[in-house]
């Protein structure tokens, strides 16, 4: 299953990037692989709202099992101010979900509050 993590680098982490510029992709990949996943991509965005986006692929049970460990390791390092992770799917894989929603909508399984 795909997971998208995004977050902010701490002031301390930003100082470290300026003091010792380096590509952190290998370090991120090592952590992800150590937790049973695979790094798909890692981006620095530095736009004010967030500083990085990481896309990983984990078996669901592995990710949920290791989410707290990941959070403790990354946030405990002092380099990261905040991080959030959400599940994701490729657009082509979402078609099945769209079809299921279409079937449910046509069966009127959900009625909006304004309709009752």
Predicted regions and their residues:
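Short S/T/G/P-rich N-terminal loop/turn motif that feeds into the first structured element of a domain
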Residues: 1-31, 38-40, 44-50, 64, ...
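Short, conserved catalytic or adaptor-binding loops enriched in Gly and charged residues
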Residues: 30-33, 74-76
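An amphipathic, aromatic/His-enriched active-site/gating alpha helix that lines ligand/cofactor pockets
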Residues: 57-87
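Short hydrophobic/aromatic beta-strand micro-patches
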Residues: 8, 53-59
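A short, amphipathic edge element
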Residues: 36-40, 80-82
């Amino acid at each position: 299953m795909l997971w998208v993590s995004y977050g902010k680098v701490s002031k301390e982490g930003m100082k470290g990037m300026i003091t010792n510029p380096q590509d952190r992709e290998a370090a991120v990949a090592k952590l992800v692989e150590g937790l049973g996943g695979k790094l798909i991509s890692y981006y620095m965005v530095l736009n004010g709202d967030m500083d990085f986006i990481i896309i990983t692929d984990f078996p669901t049970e592995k990710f949920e099992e290791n989410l707290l460990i990941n959070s403790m390791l990354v946030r405990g390092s002092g380099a990261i101010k905040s991080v959030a992770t959400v599940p994701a799917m490729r657009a082509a894989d979402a078609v099945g979900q769209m079809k299921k929603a279409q079937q449910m909508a046509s069966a009127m399984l959900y009625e909006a509050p304004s309709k009752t």
